[in-house]
């Protein structure tokens, strides 16, 4: 019984591999990037996003909710979707995202980096140059500056009185 299970698992993986092959028949190199599954991790401030892109219809699932439910702001929706729009791949991938920590802006930035890294992993030759030029593969290193002792905030000092 165990042999049959292993054989069926091998058959399924062979079919899956065949469905996502990168080989083309004619006109190789003339089309856009390959449609295959990919994974990327993005970080921004305190937020961490784990992004899976699978061939599909352009549906977003962020922590089990749609893009519009999770990010009501059109600005954040546009930011998250910008790497896909840049490469003209709208409607070709479904995004499954798990994002944790930070606020909405940090999470949107983390998802954008994760999506860009996933697209880079899918087809490095076709996608990397455009993503790099737009700055989507660069991690935004800006984080909140820590509070210092003797100050009210990171840099705000107590009011000075000459006398």
Swiss-Prot record:
Keyword terms of this UniProt record: Ribonucleoprotein, Ribosomal protein
Keyword Ribonucleoprotein carried by entry: yes
GO CC terms: cytoplasm; small ribosomal subunit
GO molecular function: RNA binding; structural constituent of ribosome
Region (Disordered) residue spans: 1-40
Keyword Lipid metabolism carried by entry: no
Low complexity bias: start-end ranges: 1-25
Superkingdom assignment: Bacteria
Pfam families in the record: Ribosomal_S9
Biological processes per GO annotation: translation
InterPro entries linked to this entry: Ribosomal_Su5_D2-typ_SF (IPR020568), Ribosomal_uS9 (IPR000754), Ribosomal_uS9_bac/plastid (IPR023035), Ribosomal_uS9_CS (IPR020574), Ribsml_uS5_D2-typ_fold_subgr (IPR014721)
PANTHER family associated with the record: RIBOSOMAL PROTEIN S9, SMALL RIBOSOMAL SUBUNIT PROTEIN US9M
Family recorded in the similarity comment: Belongs to the universal ribosomal protein uS9 family.
Protein name: Small ribosomal subunit protein uS9
Source organism of the structure: Bifidobacterium animalis subsp. lactis (strain AD011)
Lineage: Bacteria, Bacillati, Actinomycetota, Actinomycetes, Bifidobacteriales
Gene: rpsI
């Amino acid at each position: 019984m165990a042999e049959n299970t292993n054989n069926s698992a091998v058959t399924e993986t062979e079919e899956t591999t065949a469905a996502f092959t990168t080989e083309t028949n004619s006109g190789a190199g003339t089309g856009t990037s390959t449609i295959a599954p990919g994974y990327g991790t993005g970080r921004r401030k305190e937020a961490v996003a784990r992004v899976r892109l699978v061939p599909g219809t352009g549906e977003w699932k962020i922590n089990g909710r749609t893009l519009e439910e999770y990010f009501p702001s059109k600005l954040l929706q546009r930011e998250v979707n910008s790497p896909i729009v840049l490469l003209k791949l709208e409607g070709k991938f479904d995004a499954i995202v798990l994002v944790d920590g930070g606020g909405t802006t940090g999470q949107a930035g983390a998802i954008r980096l994760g999506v860009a890294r996933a697209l880079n992993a899918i087809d490095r030759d076709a996608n990397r140059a455009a993503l790099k030029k737009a700055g989507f593969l660069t991690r935004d290193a800006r984080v909140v500056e820590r509070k210092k002792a003797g100050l009210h905030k990171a840099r705000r000092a107590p009011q000075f009185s000459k006398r």
